[in-house]
């Protein structure tokens, strides 16, 4: 089915429709999958990309900000990178394609393309409502990824890293991961560009965490300076499940990272920590929708942002507490350092509480470096530039140091330090 339109579209919207018409013969999927693909792109064509008039996209005018849509998957060569933590297992999606030979001891690992071909992926491709532009784009174009299952009782002695590496073009991947009961594991989801043309990247991770499991999940995004990165995490926490989620954005020209989290099991707990490093004329938007659906659950969210030059950042955090979710304890904070007069950051915290026996709160700060702290360091002979760098590094490193794996802390601090050295 060729997508036709008579509506007035932007060049990016037109390019998406033309790319789908050009690529559909090569995309994997059975009839049911293509019925979903066609319908979702048709909806995107009819409604267009979101503008500021759409509440969820008010601070990110996606329709006008999205300029670059490569026509195909790109011809660049991408290779797997060394593990973030030396010696840890790595499986990679290179230029949008997963490996037939990927395997991890004691886990079930399959290519997502196989789920598209046999139709098993059709249900999961659905968008999360009328404003889910990322879900629609990804479902329309997704080619591959991994489906990973952790059996009950699995304990990993090193982080498992899934790398999404590209060298330009259109790259659309999917990562459904199911953790059974009583699993203990650390998972690294790493997105990175190597030298090559600019890219439009979309990635959807579907994470289900079973009863009593304790999971640390790290998203490390280091796309190229001209890349668009559209990331989405769909997370479901079961009974007594514990999730520590760390999201680090340190790249990309236009970034939208969405977190849809359901605390669906009694006794479940979420710890979310985010670091957003912005420079140049980039735009990064982190949007979270967190639902506490049952009694006796908890969550804490702390987001740290550093904004240089003419960059623009956004954090939208919505916490919804259902009527039956008594004894919910939810706290959210967003703290931002603006490092230039032209830098901007918008914060929109929201609470929707329908239960009466809860403890919920939120707070936000947007400021320059504390003058007293800067004076203290300079009074001891430290040059101003170095003193500023030390304070910025300490501001974000505090988040990373909450991780228990010292090798992982060291690796992530290295990423942060390298970014700050380049941009500060």
Where are these regions (language model features)?
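Short, low-to-moderate order helix/coil transition modules at the start of elongated helical scaffolds
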Residues: 1-214, 220
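Conserved beta-strand/loop scaffold segments within soluble protein domains that form the structured core
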Residues: 2-5, 124-382, 396-424
